[in-house]
Amino acid sequence: MPVLHNRISNDELKAKMLAESEPRTTISFYKYFTIASPQQTRDALYQVFTALDVFGRVYLAHEGINAQISVPQSKVETFRQQLYTFDPALDGVRLNIALEDDGKSFWVLRMKVRDRIVADGIDDPSFDASNVGDYLKAADVNAMLDDPDAVFIDMRNHYEYEVGHFENALEIPADTFREQLPKAVEMLREHADKKIVMYCTGGIRCEKASAWMKHNGFNKVWHIEGGIIEYARRAREQGLPVRFIGKNFVFDERMGERISDEVIAHCHQCGVSCDSHTNCKNDGCHLLFIQCPQCASKFNGCCSEQCCEELALPEEEQRRRRAGRENGNKIFNKSRGRLNSKLSIPDPAE
């Protein structure tokens, strides 16, 4: 029986990827469709992807698939063909190609079965996720941005919105997508007669959010086809003004794609203009924050003097301290509250 998971250390895999001579293409795709046996599908797809030297992160659930991957350039077309023929539901699925790509976005293939491909917290049995809003293409997006009757809603996390968003888009202040959904309904009640335009990175969150808004009585709902990635690509190809301002945060080693020249965020430590995210180098912290080159040098890549001091401790002492911390206070906690607390940043909601 073939091995259906990775057995090599992350350090070895990363070194191997960095030593590759062939360029890679970073691709993301998703599809909401019924998967009867997610584990069986996962195992079969793992073998297909492994044979093509695909790296990345793939989630499968009964409701569909969500993938962010990198593929050797010489195998992209073979990958496309094998994906499209793997299941009829995947035939022709849109592949979002990264806008900025050094080919170093992933170095290992991880495939996981989950309850949902996007954690939404929805437990209403009458909710129909297929009853989505209408798609908007790039030219339509620009027209909507000039329509005083339209309201743009950003369905991404606070750290994504901070470095880039559409002109005058509303941020839904919440730490997770599941928290955003009910809050979006609440916030938009006063705009019930407006045209609601929802967007996210690649389309997967805003597509479900558009269905949720319709489920809650909103009738004029749109979402951007392919999200920010597809919008920017098509706008550039068609010679249209790109109306997204700043950087598009992405969930891989790049942590962002430059969409426009504007830098709308600031270093969380000194306040200079900066939109480069990083994780605190202290393994007991890993706070996601924005850091300029000068502060990166001053704090040795850490978010605070405390973490800088801890990073300088012997490895054994660092491990001892990490063992005594709650998991929720580590890298997986990207909440605005933790960021504000660690770096003494005023809460914009207050």
From Swiss-Prot:
The gene is trhO. Residues 146-240 form the Rhodanese domain. This is tRNA uridine(34) hydroxylase. It holds the Pfam family Rhodanese. InterPro entries: Rhodanese-like_dom, Rhodanese-like_dom_sf, Rhodanese_C, TrhO, TRHO_N. The active site is at C200 (cysteine persulfide intermediate). Catalyzes oxygen-dependent 5-hydroxyuridine (ho5U) modification at position 34 in tRNAs. HAMAP family: TrhO (MF_00469). SUPFAM superfamilies: Rhodanese/Cell cycle control phosphatase. The keyword tRNA processing applies. Its EC number is 1.14.-.-. The keyword Oxidoreductase applies. Residues 319-350 are annotated as: Disordered. One of its GO terms (biological process) is tRNA modification. PROSITE patterns: RHODANESE_3 (PS50206). It is an enzyme of class 1 (oxidoreductase). It catalyses: uridine(34) in tRNA + AH2 + O2 = 5-hydroxyuridine(34) in tRNA + A + H2O.
